[in-house]
Amino acid sequence: MFKNTLTLSLALFCSFAAQAQPVIPRDADVESQVESLLSKMTLDDKVGQMCELAIDKVAQRSSDDHVRDNSSVVSLANGRLSASAVNDVFGRWKVGSILNVPEGVAQAPEVWSDIIRALNDASASQCGGVPEIYGVDQIHGASYSWGATLFPQEVAQASSFNKAIPYRIGQITAYESRACLIPWVYAPVMDLARSPLWSRMWESYGEDVLVNATMASAVTKGLQGSDPNHLGMNNVAVCLKHYMAYGAAVSGKDRTPSSVTYRELMEKYFQPFRASIEAGALSIMVNSGNNSGMPFHANRKLLTEWIKDGLHWDGMIVTDWADIDNLWKRDHVAANKKDAICMAINAGIDMTMDPYSTDFCSLLTELVNEGRVPMARIDDAVRRILRLKIRVGLMDRSTWDIPYGVKSAKRPKGGKSSKATNLANMYYDYGSDDFAREAVSMAEECMVLLKNQNSVLPLSMGKKILVCGPNADNFRPMNGGWSYSWQGDRADEVCRKIGKYHTFYEAIAVEFGKDNVCLDEMVKYDARNFNLDRVVNAGFSLDKLPFDPDVIIACIGENSYCETVGNIDDLTLSRNQLDMVKALAKTGKPVILVLNEGRPRLISDIVPLASAVVHTFLPSNYGGDALANLLSGDANFSGRMPYTYPRHHGSFITYDCKPCEYVETMQGAYNYEANTTVQWSFGYGLSYSDVKYSNLKVSSIPASAGTAPLMKGFTPRTAGGPRYAANDSIRFTVDVTNNSDRSVKEPVLLFVSDLVASLTPDIKRLRVFEKVPLAPYESKTVTLSVHPSDLAFVDDDLQWVLEPGQFRATVANQRVEFELK
């Protein structure tokens, strides 16, 4: 079969030819405020707006020694700051933003609000009426706010294949962040998790482009609301991160180089960012690494040409932690800090996260005066920063100059706290039981049943259960990093003080009865350090148990970690845990493996020994309750794998790889029908229901309306080839039937394979998915629509190409071929 590629005239310019308007519609009032403020600023004022410092820099501390992370002492009684430091930062340097968490640990909303009110007041009074903007890593809920509702981490959310979940998480996160007066969150993370070694895999929505784009767009809308020009009091500005290919590091280690072609960057890694920008995202944080020798912080093509000019985007770009310093200290592409600043600002950086130094301000001022950084570039950056502050409401003092106050015994009259005059009552539902119930329900959808031999699950009441393993009675691995502290190492301390959450063991004991459940961890993590694989035995005997168990639940995986601390060389699960499971299997009792890990640790030696395997990912504080509900059958599994789980070292591939990436092995060579050599495939998952698929059909294929020219663009809708209207779609129908007495939410995933192309196509790509609720014995005909241009690919000239020819669509065990003419 031969496929003709249409080679037509090339366009010379990037971006959407048809989209002349900004991706976020311009608002005349917002732009008028921006220009009015900018016109009154001196160069010092402008440069200060471009600087972001850590909270430690303005905190009350006991000495004048160099401030390092967590060394400062903030008085938690009243949020007291150092008056001299505050005056220096805002009065002298005119700093535009503060970030991070006082004392490195989550704070109560009344403490947060006292600190941010004080900072906003000081900065507004000394920076021409422009308050600073405070940024925090609120990754899976308001995770640095004491008593807020925490949700499953992003990789777990992706396993739900339900975009309503990240949308709702975004809404609640924004609400509870604004209760603390936090207006700007460094989320969502939308790095494609292409390496299973990567220490930040759990922060992403998995390995697939569409899942990342869909989930990140949903959470962006949940966080920011429907109008990016006018965020409400229940909304926060997002900061998409980390632009881009952060999860493609060749070594799999944090902040190490990637080697991705511009063609693949455009076709895959860029698309989730594009989708979220189209959803209204107001800011972006940059990848700390480099690609093929070019640091992302110095890459004008990616920062300015692709994002700002290509998408007509007027948002703001901020560095990651001290990354301008990395240009000269680590990457050696600049001789000194001044040259590094020049390089980054001219590439398109608008704000630098230079946490403990104001050198940026003086050096950038010198660069402008020397003519090395144009004043127009400074004005452009400051416009973007001011626009962000106006959009989030900071220029309206009434949005942040609000006392926290005391929460009323009853909700204030007027519906959703509309009559409240303090933060405690304005955000009456902060940390509420209603939010907790939603978190449990979400966590249930975010767990995946991977094995259920002889239907050992669900467990019947009355069984004697042994719960063991280092993750059995520990909030830290349940939550992961960015949970109350950077590494998540304060989670047990905080959660047990709050006192309303359950570990896996505690929740199972509540569900099945305390007399029927006992705990013997057998293996524990070493609490003395962050070494992930340093687990120590805590006794290894079944003889000490109060009863002879009917079933054993082994909770295994990883401790919490974040960023470089999570770097590893060996993906294999720790030897102590593997040996523990092997010893448990020798008892002859059914062993249920509960995986609680941020990335897929290799467990091929013990999977055959288990009767069941459940993946919980990082389910957070309500994960214990969710797991207990699923194990008992009170809830049904509906999650699917958001990444490919490897079986062996050296077989780290993604589902959308090229055909030649599969090497013939004892398990068989790849073809469209064969099984792969992975442990569990992307999209795999079981439930307690018997769901069958049938009658996959192509119900309609639109006719093309002529041809479109090839052009450099940033979305498949700019593809050259057959031309289709914006509302055209290829419609597929498939019958989905629940042949069981249990209701279920079934993720219906449609993959498409391009059978012949001018460049080697991926084996298959997920093109659309939908979560379909099915009552017992219910059957539904599900319609799935794909725009023809979504089948396009990027060629070596960075042009989207849609080639006519044969394609194959797959849903579960159903396949159908179709042709685009």
Stretch-by-stretch model annotation:
Residues 1-23:
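Bacterial Sec-dependent N-terminal signal peptides
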